[in-house]
Amino acid sequence: MTRLVSGVALAAATLVAIRFLPLLPLRVLACLVAALAAREYLELVDSPIRVVVLVVAMCWVVSSTAVASPLVLLTMALLWVAAEVLFSNHSIQQASTGVFGAVYIGMPLGMLVAVHALLGWQATLLLLGTVVVSDTMQYYTGRLFGRHPLAPAISPKKTIEGAVGGVIFGTLFLTVVGARILPFSGYGSLVTLGILVVLFGICGDLFESRLTRAAGVKDSSSLIPGHGGVLDRIDALLFAIAPFYLYVRNVT
């Protein structure tokens, strides 16, 4: 019951925020999500470099609609790695792990805000809906037909059959709904986009599972009752946004 209540509340809050919040408050909310997710990431990898990671991740969200800002931030991040190694006791691995966290979380959430700025709330909800439909159908298809493990060393319960179900239903959802929402460039493009979004989302889910397994924990945190942490909720989205964002940038 706790999982159901918190899930419904989270879904309702997300829907209201995306549908009704202007762009500036939405950026602030995305920054908060980035900060919470980055904090969980830093706990998982046990990184001593914390404040700068949080700041860079949030800066990526704030500057998401500026064309040159990702390159500027990436250059700053690389310089930061060099500075950390030269002027502190942190190793190259520690500094690089911190920078990766800022990119892994900040850049995708910045892309999500950019999608909202370019095409509005409907396109944003289309992406989120595709991820949710895919995740849900992976679960149910896997339970009904799952026989062959997808990545047993990382996520033993995920199956190839479940992944196929997620691809089919997620792609179908994006194609049918996207034809009404996105700038139309043919059903072939939408089907390809749907497949890429779902496959990237599956990779994002597996990547976060790898992080938690390496840390010896089940969830990234216990912030959301019954659902784990923020990173657990957005893991698929962080990867799935990339092909969706590139499509939006190229057709608008």
Question: Which positions does each model-derived feature cover?
Answer:
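Short helical (or helix-break) motifs at transmembrane helix termini and adjacent helical loops
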Residues: 133-143, 201-213
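Membrane-embedded alpha-helical segments of transport systems
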Residues: 137, 164, 231-239
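Membrane-embedded alpha-helical bundles of polytopic integral membrane proteins
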Residues: 1-196
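Interfacial loop-to-transmembrane junctions
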Residues: 213-237
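Transmembrane alpha-helix interface/packing and boundary motifs in multi-pass membrane proteins
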Residues: 197-201, 225
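Juxtamembrane boundary at the C-terminal end of a transmembrane helix
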Residues: 245-252
